[in-house]
């Protein structure tokens, strides 16, 4: 692994099975204590110290969990690999059946795995008096509603 040596395991706290699968994965991969950390996507914003030293984040859930994770991890430039456990999984790279056979390639930087950098958009809503009311980052698209 690179100078960043920690692996983050992120789950959706609304679905306890995602945390169970994250913990099971840590055990099955035989990761040493101190080389990994676990967080829900909902509390990930409290993990800035851990994210500074993270080489990869493994996200258990659907596209919503992945998008919540990206909002926090993007400023740390942490690559993600998604494990599909939600209803929608277009953004997830792996299924739960592929964890043991393929996830080590991502974690231990197999040369066949390439990181795809994605552009993000930032939208800011400014009121008529030029005050910024809201700012949001987006990976996929922006939508205006009246």
Please identify what each model-predicted range represents.
Residues 90-146:
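Catalytic core of DAGKc-family lipid kinases
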């Amino acid at each position: 692994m690179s100078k960043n040596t920690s692996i983050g395991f992120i789950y959706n706290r609304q679905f306890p099975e995602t945390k169970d699968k994250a913990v099971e994965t840590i055990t099955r991969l035989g990761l040493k204590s101190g080389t990994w950390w676990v967080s829900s996507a909902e509390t990930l914003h409290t993990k800035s110290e851990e994210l500074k030293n993270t080489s990869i984040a493994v996200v258990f859930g659907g596209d919503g969990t992945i998008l919540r994770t990206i909002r926090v991890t993007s400023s740390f430039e942490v690559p993600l690999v998604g494990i599909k456990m939600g209803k929608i999984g277009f953004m997830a790279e792996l299924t739960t059946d592929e964890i043991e056979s393929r996830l080590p390639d991502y974690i231990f930087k197999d040369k066949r795995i390439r990181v795809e950098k994605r552009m993000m958009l930032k939208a800011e809503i400014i009121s008529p008096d030029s005050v910024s009311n809201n700012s949001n980052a987006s990976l996929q698209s922006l939508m205006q509603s009246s």
